[in-house]
Amino acid sequence: MDKYAVIGNPVEHSLSPVIFQAFEKQTNHSFDYLKIKAPVNGFAAAVKKFHDEGGKGANITLPFKEEAYQLADKRCQEANEAHAASALQFREDGTIYAVNYDGLGLVQDLTRNHNITLTQKSILIVGAGGATRGILGPLLNAAPEKIVIVNRTPSKAHALAKIFHLRGEIQGGGFDELEPMRYDVIIHATSLGHQGKFPPLPDGLVGSQSCCYDLSYGKIASPFLQWAKDQGAKYNFDGLGMLVEHNAAVFYLWFGIYPDTNPVIEMLQAHL
């Protein structure tokens, strides 16, 4: 039986096995899907071992996305822009193909599942790390009016804006540089939720029709989404749908079939 996996450290929390099991039942495909906890300094060896044992593909989670990108022989455009891979495909000719579908998953969740329009909208992204870099390309493809990146270290936000400046109206800065305006979409992309915190955002950013979205899901997303509700945001979503949509795109890469994501999202929401 073909083998697939999610590789990360930690990996115990990953919902990907549950999601792929649901896709497996839905599409009548049979395969094994494993959780592989790779040593922090042993990712390449773990990938080689899995590949040598007949592995066909792997989802990649923290902290190995950049290393997975470097390991690949060929990469999709989104992976090249992000300098990170969210999944690998082990091809018949022995080469490794890297993709990054994080941004695709986000845009699919926002536009298809939640009916949020991104075209000609103002988007604020909070955080300038790898998560933000991974979503910028697909967000810019949606032709927003502008994207503003805000970060505790302004230079990181400026650097990201510079990388993508040819793709559309994009700027970066620190929290004290934020213009007093109401954004259509605010995306939280920092890891502060793991500590039960959220960034020092000023009042006045959220309008009556604003959508606030946390890339994390469950309890980790709670601090930011509670802030959004307190600020009066009309729409508040966590990143569970993004994860499912990401994995649906990976499933299509591996099997050539695009699964129905709605029942899987509903199933996970009922159990989380």
Curated annotation (Swiss-Prot):
- Kindly state which reaction or reactions the protein catalyses: shikimate + NADP(+) = 3-dehydroshikimate + NADPH + H(+)
Provide the binding site for shikimate. S14, L15, S16, T61, D102, Y217
Q: Which GO terms describe its biological process?
A: amino acid biosynthetic process; aromatic amino acid family biosynthetic process; chorismate biosynthetic process; shikimate metabolic process
Q: Which GO terms describe its molecular function?
A: NADP binding; shikimate 3-dehydrogenase (NADP+) activity
Q: List ligand-binding residues for NADP(+).
A: G127, A128, G129, G130, A131, N151, R152, T153, P154, S155, K156, L215, G239
User: Which residues are annotated as active site?
Assistant: K65
Associated pathway = Metabolic intermediate biosynthesis; chorismate biosynthesis; chorismate from D-erythrose 4-phosphate and phosphoenolpyruvate: step 4/7
Thylakoid: present as a keyword of the record?
A: no
Annotated function: Involved in the biosynthesis of the chorismate, which leads to the biosynthesis of aromatic amino acids. Catalyzes the reversible NADPH linked reduction of 3-dehydroshikimate (DHSA) to yield shikimate (SA).
User: What is the recorded name of this protein?
Assistant: Shikimate dehydrogenase (NADP(+))
Origin species: Coxiella burnetii (strain CbuK_Q154)
